A protein has these predicted regions:
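C-terminal catalytic core of Y-nucleophile DNA break-rejoin enzymes
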Residues: 53, 117-136, 142-169
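Short, charged phosphate-coordinating catalytic segments
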Residues: 29-40, 89-109
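Conserved tyrosine-mediated DNA breakage-rejoining catalytic core shared by Y-recombinases
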Residues: 46-47, 92, 101-137
């Protein structure tokens, strides 16, 4: 009944329903350990929720190089910064949110030290020649709050990346 309620009344998808069920099971386990109830039926309850596998979209190495080497038209130079930030994300495996928060003080000579936004993991990431070149390009340019790179809003960046992909025929 609870699953039907979440699906029909709250308009939740199966992945969200699965998370809600996980929260409920956690609470029921906690309350059982505290002797608030003696029912353990929840422990064996495994709803069959259909999920569609996520389609992973990625660039091949050739496509990444094509983007890196693409000559941006003179009237669209604003796309250069977007490309650089995107390529930095690719070459370091950092999420947009982590590059958005990357400060100059996080940049060391051969690596960067970051605490990720999503998982709060502390990481030390070795810089390859591509990521070093991007940081070097912007090292003398001042950005607000001592940021290392010229990161714009995620929505704008996605819009510009789409345009850049079309221009570069990727």
């Amino acid at each position: 009944e609870y699953i039907n309620f979440l699906r029909d009344k709250k308009d939740m998808r199966n992945s969200t329903i699965g998370k809600q069920m996980g929260f409920l099971k956690w609470f029921l386990r906690w309350s059982f350990k505290k002797d608030y109830h003696q029912n353990i039926a929840y422990d064996t309850f495994k709803p069959k929720l259909k999920t569609t596998p996520k389609k992973v979209i990625f660039l091949t190495w050739d496509e990444l190089n094509k983007l890196k080497d693409y000559q941006i038209p003179k009237d669209k130079q604003y796309l250069e910064r977007v490309r650089d930030v995107f390529l930095f994300c690719c070459f370091t495996s950092l999420r947009y949110s982590d590059v958005r928060n990357l400060k100059r003080s996080d940049v060391k000579s051969d690596h960067i030290e970051v605490t990720t936004v999503k998982t709060a993991d502390s990481l030390s990431i070795e810089l390859n020649k591509y990521s070093k070149a991007i940081l070097e390009k912007y090292k003398d340019i001042h950005f607000e709050n001592h940021m290392a790179l010229p990161v714009i809003s995620n929505q704008k960046m996605n819009d510009y990346l789409k345009a850049l992909g079309e221009l570069a025929e990727i």
